[in-house]
Amino acid sequence: SSEAAPEEKVAILGA
């Protein structure tokens, strides 16, 4: 997503 939702950030940062 362009504007990463909290859960998406977790997926990105927690990759």
UniProtKB/Swiss-Prot annotation:
Q: What is its EC number?
A: 1.1.1.37
Q: Which GO terms describe its cellular component?
A: mitochondrial matrix
One GO BP: tricarboxylic acid cycle
Which GO MF terms does the UniProt record name?
A: L-malate dehydrogenase (NAD+) activity
Keywords for this protein? Mitochondrion, NAD, Oxidoreductase, Tricarboxylic acid cycle
Where is it located? Mitochondrion matrix
Q: Which reaction does it catalyse?
A: (S)-malate + NAD(+) = oxaloacetate + NADH + H(+)
Q: How does it assemble?
A: Homodimer.
Q: Which family does it belong to?
A: Belongs to the LDH/MDH superfamily. MDH type 1 family.
Q: What is this protein called?
A: Malate dehydrogenase, mitochondrial
Q: Which organism is it from?
A: Nicotiana tabacum (Common tobacco)
The upper taxonomy is: Eukaryota, Viridiplantae, Streptophyta, Embryophyta, Tracheophyta
